[in-house]
Amino acid sequence: MIWRDKSYLPEEMSFSVNYLGAEVTQVGLNFSRPAAQVLGQYYNFIRLGWEGYHDIQNNSMEIARYCHERIGAMACFENYSKDVVNPLFVWSLNEEYERTAKWTLYDLQAALQQSGWMVPAYSLPKDIEDITVMRIVVRQGMSRDMADMLLKDIANAVAEFEKLQYPTQSRLQWEAQEKQHGKVFTH
């Protein structure tokens, strides 16, 4: 469908979300999807076979569980869920830690981005937007060595943040209850 301009677009068809550091608005018809992803998955399934595809997914899950466990063991973080059922997981700052921290997850996002990692920090949807989380999606090709490098970069960033004498700008915004966005990722 094509609309002459934005004013003709029914507001009910658009959905906005704070994603990867920017407000993203998406328009779509319910239950409509492009076929390219389905074709790509079909190709991979034919090329790799069930066992190959299964091995890739098992590796992704293993790495996700490992990262989930290690991040959850850090005193400043709290995992959103106890189990990892997909190769992704979400965590936030531990409530007690957050009360006295001089930094926010937006600062951690920026620090990780300087090390080459794209780990988004974002607020949750309406009615719980005061909660900020970070998310890791473990994709095909992420190795245990890469996971260890990411975990080391997270630990190093937290260690640097804990040396701060004064709060960061994002922490001051958090205290003032101002809406925040992480730095926008460019691909």
Question: What are the functions of these language-model segments?
Answer:
Residues 1-86, 92-97:
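Active-site C-terminal subdomain of aminotransferase-like
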Residues 12-14, 100, 147-149:
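Short conserved micro-motifs at the rims of enzyme active sites and ligand-binding pockets
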Residues 31-34, 125-130:
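Short glycine/proline-enriched loop/turn "hinge" motifs that connect secondary-structure elements
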Residues 66, 70-74, 107-117, 153-164:
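Generic non-transmembrane alpha-helical segments
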Residues 77, 122-126:
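Short, solvent-exposed loop/turn elements at beta->coil junctions and helix N-caps
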Residues 77-118, 138-140, 144, 182-183:
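Conserved PLP-binding catalytic core of the aspartate aminotransferase-like
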Residues 128-187:
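PLP-dependent enzyme catalytic core of the Aspartate aminotransferase-like
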